[in-house]
Amino acid sequence: MELLTTVASFFTPTTLFLLLNLMIGTIVVTSRLGSGSRKHYQHHDGFGSGHAPAPLARAPSIIDRVKSINFHLYKFPHPETELFSMTAHHDIIGSDLHVYPDPNPAPLQRAPSLLDRVKSINMSYFKFPHDVTGSDPHSHSHSHLDLHPDPAPAPLQRAPSLLDRVKSINMSYFKFQQYNPEENDYAHHTEPTRFESIPTRMGRVDPIDISKFRIPEEDQPTGTGVNSQINPPGLTRAPSILERVKSIKLSSFYRSDPDLDQKQNPDPVLHEEHKHVRSKSESKKPVKKKKKALTKMTKSASEKSGFGFAGSHAEAPETVESLERRRPDTTRVERSTSFGDGEDGVDAKASDFINKFKQQLKLQRLDSILRYKEMLKAH
């Protein structure tokens, strides 16, 4: 610790200032002694000239350096004497290269313009070969190729226009082959393909069994049958939704004539559906309403059976059950729906309307299939 305190006491500002002055003084003394010994050696040395050295030259400025550039070195090459004239004016002293300008320099040549450069292009390499016989120019490309240009080249030919190039296309490659039916039939019989068993569109439509769809007499097309040949004048536009809704006959829900009902419902499946609706609606009806409806029905049946004769009153009235057996199912349903009151009658009407609408959709679907088949036959 005592050593550190003694060393730290020496690093005071006064001691540091004295140390700095001592270093500066030693540098000055050594520099003076060195310069005096150098002068002594220059005067008494045998290799020295004995004269005072020349003062140092000022470094040239940037302008002097730019002015000293000799542009004669960048002129276009002259005859063989240029290299000799350049080497003749070079004076080598030690390791320095001094270039002196030529006292009689040649005049500078003007650089060639763009037009002169374009004119200097030898177009003889790009001329088209003379092909008078119509032979392929590519086959004689090696014979016409010459590394040395012709001393007296022929005048340049005009480049072919777009029309000439189009006319030069050989269309024989694109001609269709002549059709020979005998050869094609023979090739067809000798080399059958594996696509013969695939049915066409017409073959796919023919197997459709149209007998499943029953068409009413008013919607059936005119002709001997469904499969008869029909030549329609043109394709008709498919009916819109509004036309389909308008085509639904709502008057059939309030008819009581059995003949009209038999024409509109020839399908036995629909009869079964109507029986089911009738049984369901009758099960929900009260007994009094049913009796009232049956009495009205017996009265109408007796009026129809009498036909205004006097002997009809003498006969015993038929029972309601016998009348119901003789009447078709559609008539029963419509009478029950027409004479029904309340919610039961509304349900029966709604179910009948839904059945009619489904039948119309089936008929329209069958009609579209028939039109598509006729279109395929026409094509």
From Swiss-Prot:
The entry's cellular-component GO terms read: membrane
> Residue ranges of region Disordered?
133-154, 216-238, 256-347
Sorted UniProt keywords: Glycoprotein, Membrane, Transmembrane, Transmembrane helix
Which residue stretches does the UniProt record annotate as biased composition, category Polar residues? 221-231
Question: Predominant location of this chain?
Answer: membrane
Q: Tell me the domain of life.
A: Eukaryota
Q: What induces it?
A: Rapidly induced in local tissues by both compatible and incompatible P.syringae pv. tomato DC3000 strains. Accumulates transiently in systemic tissue after challenge with incompatible P.syringae pv. tomato DC3000(avrRpm1) strain but not with a compatible strains; this systemic induction is abolished by a treatment with the calcium ion channel blocker LaCl(3), thus being dependent of a cytoplasmic calcium burst. Triggered by jasmonic acid (JA) and wounding.
In this chain, composition skew of type Basic and acidic residues spans 137-149, 256-285, 322-335
The keyword Nucleus is annotated on this UniProt entry: no
So where does this one cross the membrane? 7-29
Glycosylation site list = 122, 170
List the GO biological process terms: defense response to bacterium; response to bacterium; response to jasmonic acid; response to wounding
User: A Pfam family for this UniProt protein?
Assistant: DUF4408
Q: How does it sit in the membrane?
A: Single-pass membrane protein
InterPro entries noted in UniProt: DUF4408, DUF761_pln
- Claim: Transmembrane helix is one of the keywords in the record: yes
Disulfide cross-links: none
- Where can this protein be found? Membrane
Query: Can you say what this protein is called?
Result: Pathogen-associated molecular patterns-induced protein A70
Organism the protein comes from? Arabidopsis thaliana
The beginning of the lineage is: Eukaryota, Viridiplantae, Streptophyta, Embryophyta, Tracheophyta
